[in-house]
Every structure is written in structure tokens, then in C-alpha cells.
Curated annotation (Swiss-Prot):
This is Large ribosomal subunit protein uL29. SUPFAM superfamilies: Ribosomal protein L29 (L29p) (SSF46561). GO terms for molecular function: structural constituent of ribosome. Belongs to the universal ribosomal protein uL29 family. Transmembrane segments: none annotated.
Length: 66
């Protein structure tokens, strides 16, 4: 997911996206623990996507306050 795509989302959509990514991260960790994970690089992708969503959500919240 690109940062420009994330910036286009509303605050509610960002919350939904964050919840979806956290759920995916949980499932990937579970697959890794049980040895079923095929694409281990997806864990890092999801982790960075979560960081992007959180960063942009925080920036949008700061813009509203300012």
C-alpha cells in the first residue's frame, strides 16, 4: 500500500484499514508459529503498512487540532 493511497482515506477508513492490517498481522504470526507461512516477507510488508496508516492518521489528527 502506497502512502498516497493511505492519505486519500478518511479517518474512519484509516481505523478500518488499521484493524484489518492488525488482524492480518496476527494471522501471519500464527502461520509462522505453526510453520504454514509461505511468504515470510509479507510480515514486514504488513508491519510497515501499519506504521504508514498510524503515521498518516496522526498527521490528520494534528491538522484538525491546528
Amino acid at each position: 500500500m502506497k502512502a498516497s493511497d493511505v492519505r486519500a482515506l478518511t479517518a474512519d477508513q484509516l481505523k478500518e484499514e488499521l484493524a484489518k492490517l492488525k488482524k492480518e498481522q496476527f494471522n501471519l504470526r500464527f502461520q509462522k508459529a505453526t510453520g504454514q507461512l509461505e511468504k515470510s516477507s509479507r510480515i514486514n510488508e504488513v508491519r510497515k503498512d501499519i506504521a504508514r496508516v498510524k503515521t498518516i492518521a496522526r498527521q490528520k489528527a494534528a491538522e484538525v487540532k491546528a
